[in-house]
Regions:
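Interhelical loop/hinge segments that connect adjacent transmembrane helices in multipass membrane
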Residues: 36-52, 230-238, 253-286, 353-356, ...
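Transmembrane helical elements of multi-pass membrane transporters/channels
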Residues: 59-74, 240-252, 256, 268-344
Length: 556
């Protein structure tokens, strides 16, 4: 029985998602208020861990729960959109987003991370009074760049569509997206502030409201616009995005006012400090996004050289980039939650010159990431065919998921490495790595796609992730001396994942196109249980052997 995704199902999922995350948010807010009341009376809550560690894991768990909820709803939402407007419609909206993505980068590049880093450093050094000046400078910086980006995108939409995208149907969507850039840049400022003060619950509720609103509005718009053609469908997707950003800005600004009420600090705007950090990040992002835009523009063109028609090229590109890649990135939501919190943690330790603390945190982060990434890669590869059929009803999507599964460990590790480098102030180095990465990507896309088709793009993704991670890791190892237990973090997880995958394929009968969501869920749960049991068993044996060896060595 095929899995049919209806508009009512999507809207109901978004409502459940909103309720679930609001509950987590309110629970965390209650806990924080209770802690503040107790501390005011001269008491302390002690749970056997430092306050920073507890806050880090509280925030990480909150963001993980939020991220999984959002990504799950988003996955089914994207599947609904794909089935409603078709692969060609997804392809058109994807190429529209290449130009829009560059505009977003120009409007917001580096500002969220800049605010996070400056606010975290100021708090770590006891300079709370400088936070208002940092925020004022960041707001001015964001307004200048976002206003310019919005005007250029709106008035240049026709030229971008005709000359750059080679599809005049994209012009209307670009004009609709232009007004979203100003609120989006201001959201980045306030989001960075809340991460910097380690109150990510504020960001969580904003994201929940925004995505719930976007899903409900876009489902309604696309459901009515789909019969009108590909162009109208892309326009409705764009309209949903613009209105959502405006709603999100209103919500997060209201939360900011509540957070800062009664706060005092120096007047004026410290735009110089903001620009010093944001400029290198911005330049890196501008150049990389420009190169990324070029890359995504030439992909459909090189596919036509391979022999595909315009519609076939957009469909193939939409399947790989709009279906397979989101599935590959789905498990990374957990890592993204914690890796985003690593930036202020490393920034504070860097300011305090706590090298031992940075080393311990890096070792924990990389060891955990490796175990999780190896498991994710194995599950994506083993269930690639079923995921393609169940979520997207597409055999090609399953093929691309299997092809990209091999790069998952490198991709996830690179994500964590990048966050650590930004936390210790290595954003300029990351800038040059990202620029060379993008240049090589364009070269490989130009070279491989006419020979291999869309699989050439998959090969390009794998090669460039490996390149980026290698250079980033070399730099990080020069700054922080840390070690990773390869047996416990790579060999044992890989062996356990292979065992779980082998047993699942042996014990469960593959239904191919007829696989149901419930059957797939049971397979994945079974595989996770086998992995957990086998990995835990291997680790117990390994730890026991190490203890015996140490005792034996000590006896001599």
């Amino acid at each position: 029985m095929l899995f049919k995704i209806s508009p009512c199902f999507i809207i109901a999922s978004s409502v459940l998602h909103f309720t679930f995350t609001a509950f987590i948010y309110l629970t965390k807010e209650y806990r924080e208020r209770l802690s503040e009341m107790i501390e005011e009376r001269g008491q302390k809550i002690s749970l056997g861990a430092s306050e920073n560690t507890k806050r880090f894991f509280y925030n990480g768990i909150l963001l993980t729960a939020l991220g999984i909820s959002m990504r799950t709803v988003s996955l089914f939402f994207n599947a609904f959109i794909t089935r409603t407007i078709g692969a060609e419609g997804v392809g058109l909206y994807t190429v529209v987003n290449t130009v829009y993505g560059f505009s977003v980068t120009f409007a917001t590049a580096g500002i969220s991370l800049t605010v996070t880093r400056l606010v975290a450093s100021a708090r770590g050094e006891g300079r709370e009074e400088s936070v208002p000046r940092i925020l004022s400078g960041a707001i001015l910086y964001a307004l200048c760049f976002s206003t310019v980006a919005a005007l250029v995108l709106y008035f240049g939409a026709g030229s971008f569509a005709a000359a750059v995208l080679d599809d005049i149907r994209a012009a209307s969507s670009l004009r609709i997206l232009a007004p979203s850039l100003v609120p989006l840049s201001l959201i980045s400022v306030f989001s960075g502030y809340f991460i910097g003060i380690k109150k990510v619950a504020r960001n969580a509720i904003t994201q929940v409201i925004g995505q719930s609103f976007k899903i409900c509005a876009t489902v309604w718009l696309c459901h009515n616009a789909a019969p009108l053609g590909v162009e109208k469908s892309a326009m409705m997707l764009s309209l949903g995005t613009t209105v959502t950003e405006i709603v999100c800005f209103i919500v997060i600004f209201f939360e900011f006012l509540l957070e800062r009420r009664g706060a005092r600090g120096g007047r004026g705007a410290d735009i110089v400090s903001v620009a010093k950090v944001a400029a290198p990040l911005g330049i890196s992002a501008y150049i990389r996004q420009a190169l990324l835009t070029i890359e995504h523009i030439i992909i459909p063109k090189r596919l036509r050289v391979y022999g595909s028609s315009h519609g076939e090229a957009l469909s193939a590109y939409g399947t790989l980039h709009g279906m397979a890649l989101p599935m590959i990135l789905y498990p990374m939501v957990t890592l993204s939650s914690f890796s985003g919190l690593l930036v202020p943690e490393f920034a504070e330790r860097e300011s305090a010159d706590d090298k031992a603390g940075m080393r311990r945190l890096a070792e924990r982060a990389f060891a955990t990431t490796l175990v999780y990434a190896v498991l994710s890669a194995a599950l994506l590869f083993v269930f690639s065919e079923e995921l393609g059929y169940v979520v997207y009803k597409s055999r090609d999507a399953g093929t691309y998921i299997a092809a990209l599964a091999s790069v998952v460990p490198i991709m996830y590790l690179d994500h964590v490495t990048d966050s650590v480098l930004k936390g210790i102030g290595e954003q300029v180095y990351s800038m040059w790595v990202n620029i060379t990465d993008s240049l090589l990507s364009i070269f490989l896309v130009w070279l491989l796609i006419p020979k291999m088709g869309i699989m050439g793009y998959a090969v390009c993704i794998i090669a460039m992730e490996a390149y980026n991670f290698t250079l980033s890791l070399i730099r990080l190892c020069k700054r922080i001396r840390f070690r990773i237990p390869m047996l416990a973090s790579v060999v044992f997880p890989a062996a356990s994942a292979l065992v779980s995958g082998f047993l699942v394929k042996r014990l469960f009968i593959s239904a191919g196109r007829e696989t149901s969501p419930l059957w797939l869920a049971l397979e994945i749960i079974f595989a996770l249980c086998v992995f957990a049991g086998s990995y835990r068993g291997v680790m117990l044996i390994y730890d026991g052997a190490r203890i015996k060896i140490k005792k034996h060595s000590a006896s001599y």
